[in-house]
């Protein structure tokens, strides 16, 4: 597998949607605004409006995004195995998960987190997959060297 040589780290995370919805619903909680960017919240609110019969639509969307953020931190940590963390505190708002015009999710580190990723790993590609099945949201993140050869590039 020629593409594997460019893989730096892989992360996976699962989130229970019901428990996550309860955390979001705690009165006075700032979890949503301290964890999700305005763009992420707007996308989740839009999904909720599109699916009024689904009381968990917003929480499901945000649970998947939170799983992606957690999976990213695990992939970054795996890429630095044997070395100290590159950042003492990760700010969730610096890890944004949005969708492209065709609905595919992408993850964009920014701020101190983006700078620390660049400094600790160099230029990387962030590959993200999010899924929802029943009461669970899950995400996988693969960090790869930017421009690394892939199986598609192989003869």
What residues fall within each predicted segment?
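Core catalytic alpha/beta fold that binds nucleotide/phospho-ligands
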Residues: 1-155
């Amino acid at each position: 597998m020629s593409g594997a040589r460019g893989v730096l780290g892989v992360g996976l995370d699962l989130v229970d949607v019901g428990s996550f919805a309860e955390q979001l619903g705690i009165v006075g909680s700032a979890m949503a605004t301290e964890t999700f960017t305005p763009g992420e919240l707007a996308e989740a609110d839009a999904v909720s409006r599109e699916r009024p019969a689904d009381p968990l639509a917003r929480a499901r969307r945000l649970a998947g995004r939170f799983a992606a953020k957690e999976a990213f931190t695990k992939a970054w940590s795996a890429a630095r195995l044997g070395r100290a963390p590159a950042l003492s505190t990760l700010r969730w708002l610096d890890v944004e998960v949005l969708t492209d015009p065709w609905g595919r999710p992408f993850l964009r580190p920014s701020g101190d987190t983006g700078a620390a990723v660049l400094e600790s790993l160099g230029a990387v590609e962030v590959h993200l997959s999010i899924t929802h099945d029943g009461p669970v949201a899950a995400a996988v993140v693969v960090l790869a060297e930017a421009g690394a050869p892939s199986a598609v590039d192989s003869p």
